[in-house]
Amino acid sequence: MQRYFAHKRCCAMTAEVLADAGVQPTGNRLASWDLYIPSYGGGFSTEIADLLPSRSDQWVAGIPGSWRLTNKQMLWIGLCAAYGRQRAAQLSPESWWLEAARDRAALVEQHREGSHYILKNPILQRRTGLRLTQDLSVLLAGPEQGYTLAQRLLPELMLLHRHRFNLRLYLLLTRQDGRLEFWLHRRGRCVCAPAPFSGDLMDAEAVISRSVGSDVLADGLPFSLSEAVHHLPRPQITLARLDTVLCRVLMACRPGLQSAWCLSSNPAYQLLGVDVTISNTGGVRIIEMNAGPDLRPHCSRDHALKYRIVRDLFEHISLLPQTRPSGFRRLDVRAP
């Protein structure tokens, strides 16, 4: 790879990896680039559809239809359509689309006193787009404040040194020669809530995880995926369940991903961040997925991890020379 085109919002980590490899940016989207990085957002599918690549080996950093995974409402709707609501709730926390009359009616019917929920705003990122509540009236008024999804808060999650946590994984989607494939990186993060959990599901500091540097983690809390695995009572069984759950989620969305592609001759990839929870009994659920995941490092360890993931990505798809075995492993995702 010699040149790439990217919008100003290009991930800084991606730009750093490419600069270190001697790959030059170009401001001309009509130039003979080797990689095109779109502006991720609501219109990126249209942007890709309007591309006119001059060569069939030009890569595109975006897969139209990936919103079926990264849009929180659409992910839940896709799971329900593929498996039914009860089975879908075994793969991801039960959710209600607050802008849909049918889901609002179901929420009113299913709500019980003492139930806890987390409201999600699709526009605001990280903790600013989240709100904890037990109040049905707050749930129903959610869309007025931009909250479009209510997700059941899971009470019986595994704790690490009394802290709730989730695992942050990195999933690579590739489409080449008509094949859509899914690859999971062997490295990841353990993201913990700042405060110990005392049982109060309305305590945001103890319930909502926050990605921080290793230097400010509470004593004993793991930073990386590999460190977190050592705390699991049956790590191999839990990791196998993780693969199974992730594959089933991807199975449900694969048909839409297949049909949405608009550049038949050009290869494409997309990196997603996947947030996962583990229950006290070892059950695994996918909380959400994020497109163009936030790769801003929080410390030197975080920088090294994210730098390697991005470098491995480009080596995996042969845009950069391979310097070590790939950090990505293929997931066996078939039609549901």
Language-model-derived ranges and their functions:
Residues N290-H298:
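Glycine-rich phosphate/pyrophosphate-binding beta-alpha loops
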Residues R3-H116, I123-Q125, D135:
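Conserved N-proximal alpha/beta basic substrate-recognition cap immediately N-terminal to
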Residues Y4-A12, G27, G62-T70, L75, ...:
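Intrinsic disorder
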